[in-house]
């Protein structure tokens, strides 16, 4: 067999291996929308709700899960993310691009408090959700996760349990939805 044929075969196999690795890497990472679909019994987006202190607060995403209510602050960034519970600013580094944004945990706590004020009979927590293209450095503080972690933490129940939960949560969820309005 001529050497040039062997070289073409080797290059072709290498290209196929690279493509397969890229596809598997993409499949492995759950996207934000996929994660929300996976965990939610229902959800509402981009609403304001009374904060319990004569004001209103914006909710990006409010999800009804099998465990109760989940307030999400979504950060769909690309690159390495340096976060810390006590840091004032969080940093994102993606190649030569670098930027920072205010630590969202404090405002997330305010959003969770507002939801708890309006839905006292339901458990509620908040999470800062980074997209699959983010790599959170070190151990993320409580309340920070990636889509795969979210799906693992809030597993969707089976159909029977889902119906029971939906019925149990229905009056509370309906009331909460009625208290929300579009900004």
Task: Report the location of each language-model feature.
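A broadly used, surface-exposed interaction patch
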Residues: 84-92
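Surface-exposed interaction regions that form or flank ligand-binding interfaces
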Residues: 1-57, 63-69, 76-78, 92-183
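Polar interaction faces of repeat-based domains
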Residues: 81
């Amino acid at each position: 067999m001529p050497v040039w044929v062997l070289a073409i075969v080797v290059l072709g196999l290498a290209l196929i291996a690279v493509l397969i690795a890229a596809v598997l890497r993409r499949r492995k990472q759950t996207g934000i929308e996929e994660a929300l679909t996976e965990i939610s019994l229902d959800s509402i987006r981009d609403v304001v709700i009374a904060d319990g202190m004569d004001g209103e607060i914006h909710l990006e995403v409010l999800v009804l899960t099998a465990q109760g209510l989940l307030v999400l602050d979504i950060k769909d960034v690309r690159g390495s993310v340096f976060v810390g519970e006590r840091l004032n600013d969080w940093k994102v580094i993606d190649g030569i691009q670098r930027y920072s944004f205010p630590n969202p945990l404090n405002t997330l706590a305010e959003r969770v408090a507002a939801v708890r004020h309006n839905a006292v009979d339901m458990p509620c927590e908040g999470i800062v959700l980074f997209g699959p293209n983010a790599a959170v450095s070190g151990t993320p503080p409580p309340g920070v996760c990636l889509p795969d972690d979210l799906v693992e933490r809030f597993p969707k129940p089976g159909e029977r349990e889902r119906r029971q939960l939906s019925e149990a949560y229905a009056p509370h969820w309906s009331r909460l939805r009625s208290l929300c309005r579009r900004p």
